[in-house]
């Protein structure tokens, strides 16, 4: 299955993220996928990448979709904490002193910015022009601000917000293409155990909390979850 994803300003984005996951969940709910044989193993093409997809069916419950992402690539490290903080409407004290921001990609390259705590993440009020400049200079598409201070510390590893002025997204409630790189970075640093599934929290600041499941096993990164239909309509072409 070939999928293409566009932001509200018409920018096409790649990577296996929540947009693709939502498409698979809708196709399953609408009966557009093969109904026989239980769980499904499929493949999707996004922006030239062909990657596995697994649809898990449980009786009486919404399906769960797991998608492989590309192997992680670790890009530019941004050590100018003052510039990053200012672009996010924060001060240097809101960011961690011992870990720099870095661009990481598992299909889409995003700048991962570590904050001291959840309050710092919630305080962010990005300046779109300044943040877009920081992202262009770093070679990143969007910005994933995170802390290791989740709402549910027993079940989650990070609390996050995602901003992407480069493609017209002020803030996103769930971003699988950023959660995958974040867990890849944490796993590479020993911050999460290998071959386990962890939860990344996002969307709380928007009143649309999301819990993104991510599995990291060496070079294999998978994101998954379920979802609900929140709107329906008709598009005339």
Feature locations, PLM:
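Active-site proximal loop and beta-alpha junction motif in alpha/beta enzyme cores
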Residues: 1-16, 20-237
């Amino acid at each position: 299955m070939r999928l293409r994803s566009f932001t509200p300003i018409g920018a096409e984005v790649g990577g296996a993220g929540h947009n693709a996951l939502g498409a698979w969940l809708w196709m399953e709910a609408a009966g557009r996928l093969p109904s026989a044989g239980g769980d499904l193993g499929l493949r999707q093409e996004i922006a030239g990448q062909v990657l596995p997809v697994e649809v898990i069916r449980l009786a009486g419950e919404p399906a769960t979709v797991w998608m492989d992402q590309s192997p992680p690539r670790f890009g530019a490290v941004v050590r100018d904490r003052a510039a990053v903080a200012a672009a996010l409407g924060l001060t240097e004290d809101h960011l961690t002193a011992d870990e720099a921001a870095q661009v990481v990609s598992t299909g889409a390259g995003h700048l991962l910015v570590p904050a001291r705590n959840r309050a710092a993440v919630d305080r962010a009020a990005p300046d779109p022009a300044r943040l877009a400049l920081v992202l262009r200079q770093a070679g990143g598409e969007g910005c994933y601000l995170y802390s290791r201070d989740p709402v549910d510390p027993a079940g989650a590893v990070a609390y996050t917000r995602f901003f992407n002025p480069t493609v017209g997204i002020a803030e996103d409630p769930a971003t699988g293409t950023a959660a995958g790189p974040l867990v890849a970075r944490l796993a590479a640093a020993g911050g999460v155990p290998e071959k386990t599934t962890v939860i990344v929290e996002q969307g709380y600041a928007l009143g649309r909390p999301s819990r993104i499941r991510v599995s990291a096993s060496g070079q294999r990164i998978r994101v998954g979850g379920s979802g609900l239909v929140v709107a329906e309509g008709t598009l005339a072409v």
